Amino acid sequence: MSGDRPKRPLSAYMLWLNETREQIKKDNPGSKVTDIAKRGGELWRGLKDKTEWEQKAIKMKEEYNKAVKEYEANGGTDSGAPKKRKKAAAKPAKKAKKKESSEEEEEDESE
């Protein structure tokens, strides 16, 4: 993906979480990042009125769509499809260590 292509907009949940994360940290001191995210998910599911965040997300998506159209109109060629990566050149396998000469002699004698 080109570095100039506009970044995708955040979801309503992510907008809310970014603004609420510090308060969750204060309410749950010493929590791991995963615990904070889990608690954020619980709070989001319990949130009654999400319209503020959904409206912000809609506005950001509209701005994103406009920016993408401008990008593509100005010669942006990224279609959004991931490009196939070339496989790295195969590295030769490591050679097995040769047995020491004394071990080889012992094997020869035992036969």
From Swiss-Prot:
Instruction: Name the InterPro entries for this protein.
Output: HMG_box_dom (IPR009071), HMG_box_dom_sf (IPR036910), HMGB (IPR050342)
Q: Which GO terms describe its biological process?
A: regulation of transcription by RNA polymerase II
Residue numbers of Phosphoserine PTMs: S11
Q: Which UniProt keywords apply?
A: Chromosome, DNA-binding, Nucleus, Phosphoprotein
One GO location term (cellular component): chromosome
Query: Which segments carry the region annotation Disordered?
Result: 72-111
Residue ranges annotated as compositionally biased, kind Acidic residues, are: 102-111
Query: Do you know which Gene3D superfamilies this protein is assigned to?
Result: High mobility group box domain
Keyword DNA repair recorded: no
Localization, UniProt: Nucleus; Chromosome
Instruction: List the Gene Ontology MF annotations in alphabetical order.
Output: DNA binding, bending
Q: Which residues bind DNA?
A: 6-72
Q: Keyword Phosphoprotein: yes or no?
A: yes
Give start-end positions of Basic residues composition bias: 82-98
The primary location reported for this protein is nucleus
The family database entries (CDD domains) matched by this protein are listed as: HMG-box_SSRP1-like (cd21994)
Which family, according to UniProt? Belongs to the HMGB family.
- What this protein is called in its record is High mobility group protein Z
Q: Which gene encodes it?
A: HmgZ
